[in-house]
A protein has these predicted regions:
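PRPP-associated nucleotide enzymes
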Residues: 1-123, 127-190
């Protein structure tokens, strides 16, 4: 998606440790117009898949998931990274390693909101090593819900997570795919 790629080149910051900072428009300060365009593009990619629900993980995926959900006319369910007192004891749970934060979290969703037969589109802001997608897919598997695919805003294609999951048969549509990235050379898209 050229609009997104142009914005990444303009305002994204490549930092040491293979980190792309897009906090000025994706995952801290949200450019609602841009994320709505991303949501619209994801709708066009998945509109024929009869989505019942969008699933994401807190916190950075929530904004774009909500904007995409407006186009699909479906609710958004987000996996929490910690079980809180306002969620029932009846939950699906999976472990997810975070590339950005360098830790492992237990993610949970209430069994009240993820149901057998649901047709789920997973949406997230980044795809690097694939751990978040694997965890979200596992929650759906536990619920006997069907993952119809994943919509990703930015994929670090060179880290291999997306290619591994595609090889397993998962449909993944990424709006911006980064072929390589470094502080010295900047960003090259696929």
């Amino acid at each position: 998606m050229k609009l997104l790629e142009d914005r990444i080149l303009k305002d994204g910051i490549v930092a040491q440790g293979d980190v792309l900072k897009v906090s000025s428009f994706v995952n801290h300060l949200i450019d609602v117009e841009l994320m709505d365009e991303c949501g619209k593009e994801l709708y066009h990619l998945f509109k024929d898949d009869h989505i019942d629900k969008i699933l994401t993980i807190e916190a950075s995926g929530i904004g774009v998931a909500c904007l995409a959900a407006r186009h699909f006319g479906v609710p958004v369910l987000f996996a929490k990274k910690a079980k809180s007192s306002n969620i029932s004891n009846s939950v699906y749970t999976a472990k997810v390693a975070s590339f950005t934060h360098g830790n492992v979290s237990d993610i949970v969703v209430s069994k009240d909101f993820l149901n057998k037969g649901d047709r789920v589109l997973i949406i997230d802001d980044f795809l690097a090593n694939g751990c978040a997608l694997i965890g979200l897919r596992e929650l759906c598997h536990q619920a006997k819900a069907q993952v119809v695919g994943a919509g990703i805003i930015i994929e670090k294609e060179y880290q291999g997570g997306g290619n591994k999951l595609r090889a397993e048969g998962m449909r993944i549509e990424s709006l911006a795919k980064i072929k390589s990235m470094s502080v010295e050379d900047g960003i090259e898209f696929c």
